[in-house]
From Swiss-Prot:
Functional description taken from the UniProt entry: Catalyzes the conversion of dihydroorotate to orotate with quinone as electron acceptor.
Residues noted as binding substrate in the record, renumbered to the chain: 67, 112-116, 173, 178, 247-248
Top enzyme category: oxidoreductase
PANTHER family: DIHYDROOROTATE DEHYDROGENASE (QUINONE), MITOCHONDRIAL, DIHYDROOROTATE DEHYDROGENASE (QUINONE), MITOCHONDRIAL-RELATED
PROSITE patterns xref list: DHODEHASE_1, DHODEHASE_2
Pathway recorded for this protein: Pyrimidine metabolism; UMP biosynthesis via de novo pathway; orotate from (S)-dihydroorotate (quinone route): step 1/1
Annotated organism of origin: Methylococcus capsulatus (strain ATCC 33009 / NCIMB 11132 / Bath)
Protein name (database record): Dihydroorotate dehydrogenase (quinone)
GO cellular component: cytoplasm; plasma membrane
Length: 340
């Protein structure tokens, strides 16, 4: 409640990206206090086994909040059952020009066109090697803007090789709306080529490192039933270990006429909830248990998390809900999940 009633009003007076950077800095500083960290909280244990990994609870941080792995220890102290960092690209890139992150508070939403701004995979690995965190860490990888879609496999392969020794699972981000052409990798021959190449690469990395790291595919909410079935078929055919549903949406349903709603970029938060949950349900129907689903999109309460599980998800991730509600959201979901 301290966050929602005191800190959030102060942060929301700032530019969204400045507030984001300040929040991460505060979490980093708090983590250095160890047991005296005033933000530290423990959630009830609600173990889940997904992708062959043991999760202490099913509540994760979605990729995008800590793109560079700069705040792993600070975020871990909040009670997450797992963290996903990134999206990271092989080479550093600045992303799109500012402003590129916008709040739509009347709708509990954000619009972002960040454009995979990150410090590159070498920086992220250095941060991961420094962390004290020993929980489940996912690393989300993407392609550089300057790499054409036809050569996307090169970037994903390079990213996978680099992060493989340090990740509990690796997410292939093929669904951001802010990198031109990226979403085409979700379909047809481009998806088959990408997955075929990366599954072959994983076989070699498994032999090299003596461990098999699961691969998850993060997908968009803006797919029709035919596209969802085709994607599910590719997931099963290539042996993808999980699907993360979903990324942000290009739709503006539910935010029409609101300030910043028409900004270019992906929409996240409450307006995404129904659309993303429907994708979870359709994927669950198409997959028939052959790959687990990690739900992401519009989770603002314990009831929202339960709805994702009922739709067929095994785990949930939060981002925009966490921006609006802070650590109290995790505590609420933890209580509700423990009571199931």
């Amino acid at each position: 409640m301290i966050y929602e009633n005191l800190l959030r009003p102060l942060l929301f007076r700032l530019d969204p990206e400045t507030a984001h950077e300040l929040s991460l800095s505060a979490l980093r500083l708090a983590a250095k206090l160890g047991p005296a960290n005033p933000l530290k909280q423990s959630l009830p244990t609600s173990p889940r086994t997904v992708m062959g990994l043991e999760f202490p609870n099913p509540i994760g941080l979605a990729a995008g909040l800590d793109k560079n792995g700069d705040c792993i220890d600070g975020l871990a102290a909040l009670g997450f059952g797992f963290l996903e960092i990134g999206t990271v690209t092989p080479r550093p890139q600045p992303g799109n020009p500012r402003p590129r992150l916008f709040r739509v508070p009347e709708a509990g939403a954000l619009v972002n066109r960040m454009g995979f701004n990150n410090s590159g995979v070498a920086h992220l690995i250095a941060r991961v090697r420094q962390t004290r965190y020993r929980g489940i860490l996912g690393i989300n990888i993407g392609k550089n803007l300057t790499t054409p879609v036809e050569r996307a496999l090169d970037d994903y392969r390079e990213g996978l090789k680099a992060v493989y020794p340090y990740a509990h699972y690796v997410t292939l981000n093929v669904s951001s709306p802010n990198t031109p052409g990226l979403r085409s990798l979700q379909f047809g021959a481009l998806l088959d080529e990408l997955l075929d190449g990366l599954m072959g690469e994983r076989e070699e990395l498994t032999a090299q490192h003596g461990k098999r790291v699961p691969l998850a595919l993060k997908v968009a909410p803006d797919m029709d039933s035919r596209e969802i079935k085709a994607l599910a078929g590719a997931v099963v055919r290539h042996g993808v270990d999980a699907v993360i549903a979903t990324n942000t949406t290009a739709s503006r349903d539910g935010v029409e006429g609101l300030e910043h709603a028409d900004e270019a970029g992906g929409l996240s938060g409450k307006p995404l909830f129904l659309r993303s949950t429907e994708v979870v349900a359709r994927l669950a129907d198409a997959l028939q248990g052959r790959a687990p689903i990690i739900a992401c999109g519009g989770v603002f309460s314990g009831a929202d998390a339960v709805a994702k599980f009922e739709a067929g998800a095994s785990l949930v991730q939060v981002y925009t809900g966490f921006i609006y509600r802070g650590p109290a959201l995790l505590a609420e979901i933890g209580r509700v999940v423990a009571a199931l």
